[in-house]
Design a protein with these regions (language model features):
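RNase III-family endoribonuclease catalytic core
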Residues: 2-130
Length: 130
């Protein structure tokens, strides 16, 4: 059973995702995929910053005060902005009244919770989410 399914099945139990060396390796690996230089990865994964990454993987149900809600809002806005920007850059023919509706639908579909859940699954986030 996947971590996502386990978390759903145990919705009354608060799951605490791991925050040890494997979590740091996940974060470092994501930065490597983004082509960050090793010196920046070292800075961004210091103990203080790892606390912020931990917070970004913690739901309000797991910790009322230290959770990802503010990061979620910032991320949703950023993702939606990227989707719109990319659609117009990649498909300039969408820059018309009919295209606005198409781009709005793309933003809704790709910015949906299920899309982000699939990305989290593909990147192996579930063992680390609390």
């Amino acid at each position: 059973m996947s971590y996502k399914k386990q978390a759903t099945a145990m919705s009354s139990i608060i799951y605490k995702g791991t925050r040890g060396p494997m979590f740091k390796a996940l974060i470092s690996g994501l930065m490597e995929r983004g082509n960050l230089k090793d010196k920046y990865i070292g800075i961004l994964t210091n103990d203080e910053n790892m606390k912020k990454f931990s917070k970004a993987f913690t739901a309000a149900s797991a910790n009322k005060n230290e959770n990802y809600e503010i990061y979620e809002q910032i991320g949703d806005v950023s993702a939606n902005k990227f989707i719109v920007w990319y659609a117009y850059q990649r498909f300039p023919q969408l820059n018309c009244p009919a295209g606005v509706k198409v781009v709005a639908r793309l933003r809704i579909n790709y910015g949906a919770k299920n899309s982000f859940a699939q990305i989290a699954d593909d990147l192996g986030f579930w063992p680390y989410i609390s």
